[in-house]
Amino acid sequence: MLPPININKWIEENKSLLQPPVGAKLLYTDIDSTFVVMIVGGPNQRTDYHVNETDEFFYQFKGDMILKIVDKDGSFRDINIREGETFILPGNTPHSPQRYRDTIGLVIEKKRSSENIDKLLWFCDNKDCRKLLFSRSFHVDDLDLGKQLTPIINEFYGNEENRTCKHCNHISQKPTVNDYIQ
């Protein structure tokens, strides 16, 4: 059993690791647990929507964030999670965490079984369209989710065909860090 971790000290010592595009680092790496505990820093550069079959717990440690979601009825909405607030996201809810510069959050997810499949989805960013552009399913086989997301994010942005909407012909562009600064 590991000793307790001083989160403030851990953040100070590991701040340089909380970098775009995902900015997530595991808080615990040497334990066999049911949970994956991550510290996530901003800004991020994500426009994807992640789908995890299990619930996710968010605690906004420093600064505010926006959790963009797609409801069961297909409508898009934003959930504001302010500094000091927590939120539990139900499993199978497409979500896109939007973190701004100098923000830090804690995210707890259930460790995936061999049957659990995650997805990354991108929707047309033309607000009058919002059709699905691109998706990838994958099994989280490494506790470091950020390591697995980055190649898929790069695959999406690396090919204009992936970013071109077949319904309205809009081409989604890769965001810059400045797009996520308040």
Curated annotation (Swiss-Prot):
Name of one Pfam family that matches: 3-HAO
Q: Which one of the record's GO molecular function terms can you name?
A: 3-hydroxyanthranilate 3,4-dioxygenase activity
Give the required cofactors: Fe(2+)
What positions does the entry give for O2 binding? 46
Q: What is its EC number?
A: 1.13.11.6
Task: Give residues annotated as binding Fe cation.
Answer: 50, 56, 95
Do the record's keywords include Transmembrane?
A: no
Q: Name one GO cellular component term.
A: cytoplasm
Which BP terms does GO give this entry?
A: 'de novo' NAD biosynthetic process from L-tryptophan; anthranilate metabolic process; L-tryptophan catabolic process; NAD biosynthetic process; quinolinate biosynthetic process; quinolinate metabolic process
Task: Identify the residues that bind a divalent metal cation.
Answer: 124, 129, 165, 168
Catalytic activity as recorded in UniProt: 3-hydroxyanthranilate + O2 = (2Z,4Z)-2-amino-3-carboxymuconate 6-semialdehyde
Q: Where in the cell is it found?
A: Cytoplasm
Q: What does this protein do?
A: Catalyzes the oxidative ring opening of 3-hydroxyanthranilate to 2-amino-3-carboxymuconate semialdehyde, which spontaneously cyclizes to quinolinate.
Q: Which family does it belong to?
A: Belongs to the 3-HAO family.
Please name the HAMAP family in this protein's record: 3_HAO (MF_00825)
In Swiss-Prot or TrEMBL terms, this protein is called: 3-hydroxyanthranilate 3,4-dioxygenase
